From Swiss-Prot:
NCBIfam families: murC. It is an enzyme of class 6 (ligase). This is UDP-N-acetylmuramate--L-alanine ligase. It catalyses: UDP-N-acetyl-alpha-D-muramate + L-alanine + ATP = UDP-N-acetyl-alpha-D-muramoyl-L-alanine + ADP + phosphate + H(+). GO terms for cellular component: cytoplasm. One of its GO terms (molecular function) is ATP binding. Belongs to the MurCDEF family. The lineage of its organism: Bacteria, Pseudomonadati, Pseudomonadota, Gammaproteobacteria, Enterobacterales. ATP binds at G126, T127, H128, G129, K130, T131, T132. GO terms for biological process: cell division; cell wall organization; peptidoglycan biosynthetic process; regulation of cell shape. It is found in: Cytoplasm. Its EC number is 6.3.2.8. InterPro entries: Mur-like_cat_sf, Mur_ligase_C, Mur_ligase_C_dom_sf, Mur_ligase_cen, Mur_ligase_N, MurCDEF_pg_biosynth, UDP-N-AcMur_Ala_ligase_MurC. It comes from Sodalis glossinidius (strain morsitans). Cell wall formation.
Length: 490
């Protein structure tokens, strides 16, 4: 970014004159790294710490950030402010050291709110679909030449980054309800994709508390702001009378302000008619599979239409949409002959979905786009608490595939909970009689175990939010071939 562009940007961003260096604890996370990347491009000195290098830390290092792969008090010695994610414990030595010398310690969302304060903020919230919808909004605005800043929780494939600094007044950001930190944000426009029970430890196990928090978030909009909400979602429909702001509804429902009709899917592409008030219908070709992605697209189109973006830019952005990282990510087609000696090929897909609703949407998209394929899912449950709280839902949804390989629960720092483990879940699914799960407690044996079950024309879904994404990449790199030393699961 040149000096003239940076000077233009400063008209939208507070200069924080006394801030010398901004330190991020847990900087390798997508959300944290995205904000750090925007601030680095704005000219601020960035430092941060994490336990191991990854693509995010490498990107930041290339931008001049100082990254430490440890957590030590001396790492924050030059910091003016310390930014932390909800995943970082309060007894982290860097947080303790910062508080001892009175360096401000703030949440990630507080820094995002600072970026948004002097911009036209568009915040995308909801239990599912936030990351993809954020990328879709950013894609439309970029196609229209509006050069937005965006901060996303996942990789925006077209840009190759999680976040990007633009020169316009628009800031498009994923808003995280997992720790209720999205209440720091004060956007001009807010999208709510859906509301379901998740992260309930944040809300004391009280769903009413979660619903009220979403209402409070919407009331951060100015009175002239707008809420764009999916009326297909029963909880959103219930909450509409409590939202004291201008509302645009969207969905497949007949009473939606902006409706989806005549949805069709062919492979990884969807198409639908977008019906709107006071304007002609649009036939949208969407380069993303599934009815859930049609809903994400219409949310993005609703915001763009409200802003006055022309139909040509909207249609082109949706046609060329490249998706986000680990959202029905097609990793390729692989010949079986070197995998297990059989003829034919299989398709490998990686997907981040880890809530039953998300997993169900992925399965339905796969069934609709590839109806002749057998679905083979490798599923890694994420968190013991989520497995416990949504146990029956997981059992129901996972019974919808043809072959199921189950990895152990990815704990995300949680202690095991009796009865909320993968072995118990396999037993329950097996008892329902639709699929006979294969438990794979040792991930080293997965390639060999998977090779044993694969057949011609299979679609393999690598599903979950833990380490299963890295496993998917390794499988793709090896072309699904078990490597020497990898045992077979008996």
């Amino acid at each position: 970014m040149n000096t003239q562009q940076l000077a233009k940007l400063r008209t939208f961003v507070p200069e924080m004159r006394r801030v010398r260096q901004i330190h991020f604890v847990g900087i390798g996370g997508a959300g944290m790294g995205g904000i750090a990347e925007v601030l680095a491009n704005e000219g601020y000195q960035i430092s941060g710490s994490d336990l191991a290098p990854n693509a995010v830390t490498q990107q930041l290092t290339d931008l001049g950030a100082q990254i430490y792969f440890n957590h030590r008090p001396e790492n924050i010695s030059d910091a003016s402010v310390v930014v932390v994610s909800s995943a970082i414990a309060a007894d982290n030595p860097e947080i303790v050291a910062a508080k001892e010398v009175r360096i401000p310690v703030i949440q990630r969302a507080e820094m995002l709110a600072e970026l948004m304060r002097f911009r036209h903020g568009i915040a995308i919230a909801g239990t599912h679909g936030k990351t993809t919808t954020t990328a879709m909004v950013a894609s439309i605005y970029a196609e229209a030449g509006l050069d937005p800043t965006f901060v996303n929780g996942g990789l925006v494939k077209a840009a190759g980054v999680h976040a990007r600094l633009g020169c316009s007044r628009y800031l498009i950001a994923e808003a995280d309800e997992s720790d209720a930190s999205f209440l720091h944000l004060q956007p001009m426009v807010a999208i709510i994709t859906n509301i379901e029970a998740d992260h309930m430890d944040t809300y004391q196990g009280d769903f009413e508390n979660l619903k009220q928090t979403f209402i409070n978030f919407l009331h951060n909009l100015p009175f002239y702001g707008r809420a764009v909400m999916c009326i297909d979602d029963p909880v959103i429909r219930e909450l509409l009378p409590r939202v004291g702001r201008q509302i645009t509804t969207y969905g497949f429902s007949d009473d939606a302000d902006l409706r989806i009709t005549d949805y069709r899917q062919d492979g990884a592409r969807g198409s639908f008619t977008f019906t709107r008030q006071e304007k002609a219908d649009l036939r949208v070709e969407l380069n993303a599979p599934g009815r859930h992605n049609a809903l994400n697209a219409v949310a993005a189109i609703a915001v763009a239409t409200e802003e006055g973006i022309n139909d040509e830019s909207i249609l082109q952005a949706m046609l060329q949409f490249q998706g986000t990282g680990r959202r029905f990510d097609d990793l390729g087609h692989y010949d079986l002959v070197n995998v297990n000696g059989k003829t034919g090929e299989v398709m490998l897909v990686d997907d981040y979905g880890h809530h039953p609703t998300e997993v169900d949407a992925t399965i339905k998209a796969a069934r609709a786009g590839w109806p002749d394929k057998r679905l083979v899912m490798v599923f890694q449950p994420h968190r013991y608490t989520r497995t416990r709280d949504l146990y029956d839902d997981f059992a129901n949804v996972l019974s919808g595939v043809d072959v199921l390989l189950m990895l152990d629960v990815y704990p995300a720092g949680e202690a095991p909970i009796p009865g909320a483990d993968s072995r118990s879940l396999c037993r329950t699914i097996r008892g329902r009689g639709k699929v006979d799960p294969i438990l794979v407690p040792d991930m080293e044996t997965l390639p060999a175990t998977l090779a044993q079950v694969l057949q011609d024309n299979d679609l393999v879904l690598m599903q979950g939010a833990g380490t299963v994404g890295k496993i998917a990449r390794k499988l793709a790199d090896s072309r699904l071939q078990p490597q020497p030393g990898e045992g077979r699961h008996g």
